[in-house]
A protein has these predicted regions:
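Conserved "landmark" site that anchors the functional core of diverse proteins
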Residues: 1-288
């Protein structure tokens, strides 16, 4: 029997993601991978997969799958209703051949993660199965009718008593380390500390766009831009209008707007989960 699941519906977007392909910036390739790596790793652990196995990143729910083989499934991230053959079920769960899994809308975040025992076994590119919509690497967004092959399970599913869902707080406090171009801004730490922003509805896997306080440049820097230079995940880039953009996993590898600071990796998963309209403040610091 072929180990696979068939996609019946997808909602706004469903992508195959693992932990990405870091280390390829010199090729112009961003790291990609799950925007909330801890949630993907937890889902994998619950079904007995290695933490970095490929799973599904589901934006705003709506995914419907039919199992073509017996498999264990875990759904992590924000609290997301899961139904098997129309009956509500708790995660992790087991699917028999022919069972249909349907996911509702997540509460408290944007993206849930679905791990299936054996992992999603699509071809790897540059060492990763992740979909990178900016570079065009990896599989395209899933569509109804797609058949996803699954690998052979190598571990034993782990039972769980209580699965604590991810929830974005009412006000998201984001740490940021100043530099490398904080000298382009008047009192950069003070501006970041005093500013107030809201997550825009124009964000995606490339970055989170913010609306609110416009960051002011030093008088001698107004009207100027930098030659393109390297960017890292978490970079807070500030275009000429002063509205910050925090780069996420699919970010471009170079850019010419000044980067006032960098958000540490541990703070990025919640940013990737923040719905439009989420209030946000920065907590600036300096590298230890």
């Amino acid at each position: 029997m072929t180990r696979a699941v068939t996609v019946l519906a997808t909602g706004p977007q469903v992508l195959v993601q693992d932990l990405g392909r870091p280390g390829n910036a010199h090729l112009g390739v961003p790291p990609s991978g799950a925007l909330d790596p801890p949630s993907l790793a937890l889902a994998n652990r619950l079904v007995g997969n290695p933490g970095g196995a490929a799973g599904l990143e589901v934006l705003l729910g709506g995914l419907v799958l039919r199992a073509e083989t017996s498999c264990s499934v875990a759904v992590t991230g924000p609290a997301t209703p899961a139904l098997v053959n129309g009956v509500p079920r708790d995660s992790p769960l087991h699917l028999a051949p022919g069972d249909v899994l349907a996911l509702g809308t997540p509460v408290g975040g944007l993206r849930c993660y679905v791990a299936l025992s054996g992992g999603v076994d699509v071809p790897a590119e540059l060492g990763s199965r992740s979909a990178d919509l900016l570079s065009g690497l990896g599989p395209p967004p899933l569509a109804p009718g797609d058949v996803l092959p699954l690998g052979t399970p190598t571990g034993v599913p782990v039972g769980v008593d209580v699965l604590v869902p991810v929830r974005v707080p009412d006000v998201l406090v984001v740490p940021v380390l100043l530099g490398p171009r904080d000298d382009w801004f008047t009192d950069p730490a003070g501006q970041l500390r005093a500013g107030r922003w809201t997550v825009s509805d124009r964000g995606n896997r490339v970055g989170v766009r913010l609306t609110g306080t416009a960051l002011e440049r030093e008088p001698g820097r107004v009207g100027r831009e930098l030659p393109s230079e390297g960017l890292v995940t978490g970079a807070v880039q500030v275009p000429a209008d002063g509205a910050p953009v925090v780069f996420l996993a699919d970010h471009p590898t170079t850019g010419g707007y000044p980067v006032i600071g960098v958000v540490p990796p541990g703070a990025l998963p919640l940013l990737g989960q923040a719905p439009p309209g989420t209030p946000l403040v920065f907590a600036p610091g300096t590298p230890a």
